[in-house]
UniProtKB/Swiss-Prot annotation:
Keyword entries, A-Z: Aminoacyl-tRNA synthetase, ATP-binding, Cytoplasm, Ligase, Nucleotide-binding, Protein biosynthesis
Binding site for L-aspartate: 175, 221, 455, 503
InterPro entries, per database record: Aa-tRNA-synt_II (IPR004364), aa-tRNA-synth_II (IPR006195), aa-tRNA-synth_II/BPL/LPL (IPR045864), Asp-tRNA-ligase_1 (IPR004524), Asp-tRNA-ligase_1_N (IPR047089), Asp/Asn-tRNA-synth_IIb (IPR002312), AspRS_core (IPR047090), GAD-like_sf (IPR004115)
Cellular component GO terms, alphabetical: cytoplasm
Catalytic activity: tRNA(Asx) + L-aspartate + ATP = L-aspartyl-tRNA(Asx) + AMP + diphosphate
Name of the molecule in the record: Aspartate--tRNA(Asp/Asn) ligase
Source organism: Maricaulis maris (strain MCS10) (Caulobacter maris)
Record-marked site positions (Important for tRNA non-discrimination): 33
Protein localization: Cytoplasm
Biological function: Aspartyl-tRNA synthetase with relaxed tRNA specificity since it is able to aspartylate not only its cognate tRNA(Asp) but also tRNA(Asn). Reaction proceeds in two steps: L-aspartate is first activated by ATP to form Asp-AMP and then transferred to the acceptor end of tRNA(Asp/Asn).
Keyword Plastid: no
Gene Ontology molecular function, alphabetical: aspartate-tRNA ligase activity; aspartate-tRNA(Asn) ligase activity; ATP binding; nucleic acid binding
Assembly and oligomerization: Homodimer.
Region (Aspartate): 199-202
Amino acid sequence: MHAYRSHTCAELRKAHVGQTARISGWIHRKRDHGGLLFIDLRDHYGLTQVVLEPESPHFATLERLRVESVITVTGEVIARSDETVNANLPTGEIEVRLAELAIQSEAEELPLPVFGEPDWSEEVRLKHRYIDLRRESLHKRIVLRSKIIDSLRRRMVDENFVEYQTPILTASSPEGARDFLVPSRVHPGKFYALPQAPQQFKQLIMVSGFDRYFQIAPCFRDEDARADRAPGEFYQLDMEMSFATQQDVFDVIEPVMKGLFDEFADGRTVPDEPFVQIAYKDAMSWYGSDKPDLRNPIKMSDASETFRGSGFKVFAGMLERNPKVQVWAIPAKTGGSRAFCDRMNSWAQKEGQPGMGYIFWREAEGGLEAAGPIAKNIGEERTEALRVELGLEAGDACFFAAGDPREFAGFAGRARDVVGAELDLCEKDTFRFCWIVDFPMYEWDEDNKKIDFSHNPFSMPQIDPDDFLKLDADTDADTLLALKAYQYDIVCNGVELSSGAVRNHRPDVMLKAFAFAGYDAATVEEEFGGMLNAFRYGAPPHAGVAPGVDRMIMLLAGVENLREVVMFPKDQQARDLMMNAPAEVELKQLRELHIRTVVPDAKKG
């Protein structure tokens, strides 16, 4: 018999009754019933109940051992009596009567419990993550993570993609976040950077003649933590394809994503239809966000014309003074009560706004009656036209937000979210995907009075390249600000899973694109010379995308924090509490790297 086990703790069944088995694992729980000692023994696979009588020579030892001690048990598999069968356990029809015991490791008093999984502080959980990972729910999520990544790999291979690895030590590049820098011992005063993404490398793979690339790629960014953003490092399904249009990328990734989510849906629905494509401008207007949660059926409407020149002087005055101002109408089915309208008004005040305008409709003699101060101020005709346009009836309401879209679209979007949640309008147990497309290529930088990139500077503009080269920053500023880019995001249930683009593969177009944003050729050559030079020797049109693996797992696992699907995560301050990182290093190590630390004075107060 094997030294540690003949079976796992999830393997024994009624068919094994009468056999001698050896199992190993952690003491999950101990119970003393009628003089008998019952032990739930746990390993990676499951639980098996072990029983021993008071006369057993090992009784006192097992009574003394703390839970989470590791033992090996040898004994006869016996059937449980009918009244003691545990139907919730795969091994619930049997138990092992202990004959031999080997103690592999004794546990000290635990800093956090495993059995029962009570709430515990995140600091304690992360400091003792190896114990936290024994808890069933987290343990299952980490196994789920492995299965999801395996499924992604299989699906990409089925789409004729080949996995290639890109360097971890690379050059610093001015992307969205700060780099993690690695000093070079061999080249004093110079630094590598950990890649924020394999962006330039995957494009160079296309230039190198490979057709379809993918990688489960580690990415490193020195940025602050959020619930949906892990500090320090994360993984993405990085992909790129040659001779590809935007639609080609969609046609590849959609079946991968739908298939993955369907495989791990666990009773939730994944709609069969193609992902909805929503222009960035429409997303901001309809949902107040470029990552809308489409489980919420509310689609906001531009009500600017309803209020222009109306008796509601607050909105009418804003529209008259600033042509950029927009009024959002947020329809609220079933929200037509003064109590709910007052709650929304209070919510807006907590958000730093003076309040929230509203109209609600109720039954009255002779038909519908519109209530609320806005209805009185804009008049019956405008109120009724708005109601008809939005398809609202008695018992419904409409809320209003007004301002410059750059500042107030987000507030309107949050109001939409609150209305949908409070009124229980949102779909449950489903995944709603969409593409956000047609991002603006440029935007006006009011502070510096110049044109600047709006999102991704390396995407191809939606214009004939030769026509783009003829544009002039001074005379064609309006054309440039109206120009869209071949950029796209995947969004699921309000979570941005990925950004992607058709790449700008022509050096002349790239230099011109950067010139419009105020970058001279020398700066572009210095920052991105490696990729630019490669493009000068024959670059295919190419496009790609990179869905975030951690965020996909978070959605499929049904949790709201990435740390619940990462095996060894950092805390909110990007610290590894278990390994005590970051930490000071020896002076000798710094000398070898020809660097020294200059630690700022601690902040007072």
